[in-house]
Amino acid sequence: YINHPVEAAISRRYVNDARRRLEGMPRLITIGITGSYGKTSVKFILATILSEKYEVLATPSSFNTPMGITRIVREQLQPRHQVFLAEMGARHKGDIAELVDLVHPKYGLLTSVGPQHLETFGTIATVAATKYELIEGLPADGAAFFAGDGGICEALYAKTTIDKTLAGLAGNCAVRAEDVRVT
C-alpha cells in the first residue's frame, strides 16, 4: 500500500508516453478488437490477412490491458507500422472505454458477448454494455464490425449508427463464410 502512489505515477507516465507515441503517428490505422471470446484468434487472423499489404503490429497473445497495450506501444511500435491491432480485454465496466481512450481506434470488432467474468460484471447486460464501449468510442468516420451470432452482437449492431458490418455464417450477414470445413 505504501508504494501505490509511486506505482500509479509511474504507470500514468508510461500510459501518457504510449498515448503520445500513438498520437504522433496520425496515419496509423488503429483497430480495436473485443469480445467475451474469440479476440485473440480474430486478432491473429486479421493480422495475417493485413500483413499481406501493410506493416502490422498486433498486441501479442493476450496483452489486452492498459499496461499490456502500453508496453507494446512503447517497446514495439515503429514509424514503419501502418496498422495497429489492439486486443481489448475487460473485467469491469469502463475497462474498454479506458483502452479506447488510450488507443483511439478508428475501427472496432466485437467478436462475442457471453457469460465470461460474470463474477465481476454481475450480468450479461453489463458485459454487453462494457464490450459496446469500443463501438461507442469510435469516431463518426469509423466503422464497426460485429459477429452475426443471432443474439446480443446483432442487437448491438442494430443500435449502432456509424458505418457497420455484420459478419458470420448466417444469411443476413453482409460478410459471410460459406462451405466452411475443418481439416
Q: For each of these PLM feature ranges, what is it?
A:
Residues 32-34, 87, 112, 147:
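Short beta-strand segments
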Residues 110-183:
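Acidic, Mg2+-coordinating active-site environments of NTP-dependent enzymes
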